[in-house]
Amino acid sequence: MANLRKTHPLLKIANDALVDLPTPSNISAWWNFGSLLGLCLISQILTGLFLAMHYTSDISTAFSSVAHICRDVNYGWLIRNLHANGASFFFICLYLHIARGLYYGSYLYKETWNIGVVLFLLVMMTAFVGYVLPWGQMSFWGATVITNLLSAVPYVGNSLVQWIWGGFSVDNATLTRFFAFHFLFPFVVAGATMIHLLFLHETGSNNPVGLNSDADKIPFHPYFSYKDLLGFIIMLTALTMLALFYPNLLGDPDNFTPANPMVTPPHIKPEWYFLFAYAILRSIPNKLGGVLALLSSILVLMVVPILHTSKQRGLTFRPASQLLFWILVADMLVLTWIGGMPVEHPYIIIGQVASVLYFSLFLVLNPLVGWLENKMMNW
């Protein structure tokens, strides 16, 4: 009699994705981040659910309800710290996962890659609306500044902003709908993740050498299930340590002050994981131009597969392209630093140079160097 996990309609799906999935034998730890992102999502949904049981989405009580969670709810402080810092780990894993895809040419699985970019945008939206909920100073002013960017849309801009606000300023209606969105989006992300996996399993995983690995596949379980488990333990340990020892390390001190529409904080800035995009937004001295650059900084990922010129898939055997990849990593770090700095000399020009370099790497330098490498190898 055939094994139940191979015949039962529901178990068969899980079996084909987690047990009998043929996996390239040589995938490295860089392939762990997909499952780590799944773990982050589950962790965020669970901690978020418990926070939602005690949170009130009303401007008069939102801030004090968060304080109440931290002071009076059993282990509320822990749940909140895990949720807030879990978001940071979510983005760390996301950036590493995307970097792996760029380095090893995983973007050539176009459907999987494009759904991944959509997932990235969804997670960014979720994090943004979630940041507004505690109704601290930076929550309020962050919401005001970022939603205001929509007013740059020609003709319908102002109407669009007021429609999203539910009034003439960020107010109670805004907070209520942002809470509704923040509750809904993670489930949309979970659904999109299933589609992401569906397309990935149509082709199978890529591998570090970028060659067809059909001749050398091994079952996912037990080999990679245990390898993933090690990643889980490392990440959960790091998250727990951050949440217990340095819970406010990555937060903004302004969020310990309740939102006050009458007082603008000296430096409005988002959480660290949005700083690179914020730096690109600020580097263009025009509202609409900045908004377009902000959108393009993420959507540029969608054109990477189209601009792939090399005859090889990954960068494993392409030193010149490797150099460009690490320049991109350094550029992202510079942009992240600039995003947290005030708008003054020399930060303005550094941000502008870094922004130009960011787009040049994706749109010009990488395709050009890929083509040059082909020429050098007489391909």
From Swiss-Prot:
It is found in: Mitochondrion inner membrane. It comes from the Eukaryota. Heme b b562 binds at residues 83, 182. This is Cytochrome b. Heme b b566 binds at residues 97, 196. A ubiquinone binds at residue 201. Belongs to the cytochrome b family. The cytochrome bc1 complex contains 3 respiratory subunits (MT-CYB, CYC1 and UQCRFS1), 2 core proteins (UQCRC1 and UQCRC2) and probably 6 low-molecular weight proteins. Component of the ubiquinol-cytochrome c reductase complex (complex III or cytochrome b-c1 complex) that is part of the mitochondrial respiratory chain. The b-c1 complex mediates electron transfer from ubiquinol to cytochrome c. Contributes to the generation of a proton gradient across the mitochondrial membrane that is then used for ATP synthesis. Keywords: Electron transport, Heme, Iron, Membrane, Metal-binding, Mitochondrion, Mitochondrion inner membrane, Respiratory chain, Transmembrane, Transmembrane helix, Transport, Ubiquinone. CDD domains: cytochrome_b_C, Cytochrome_b_N. Binds 2 heme b groups non-covalently. The keyword Glycoprotein does not apply. It is a multi-pass membrane protein. InterPro entries: Cyt_b/b6_C (IPR005798), Cyt_b/b6_C_sf (IPR036150), Cyt_b/b6_N (IPR005797), Cytb/b6-like_sf (IPR027387), Cytochrome_b (IPR030689), Cytochrome_b_C_euk/bac (IPR048260), Cytochrome_b_N_euk/bac (IPR048259), Di-haem_cyt_TM (IPR016174). The chain crosses the membrane at residues 33-53, 77-98, 113-133, 178-198, 226-246, 288-308, 320-340, 347-367. GO terms for cellular component: mitochondrial inner membrane; respiratory chain complex III. One of its GO terms (biological process) is mitochondrial electron transport, ubiquinol to cytochrome c. GO terms for molecular function: metal ion binding; ubiquinol-cytochrome-c reductase activity. Its cofactor is heme b. Heme 1 (or BL or b562) is low-potential and absorbs at about 562 nm, and heme 2 (or BH or b566) is high-potential and absorbs at about 566 nm. The gene is mt-cyb. It holds the Pfam family Cytochrome_B. The keyword Oxidoreductase does not apply.
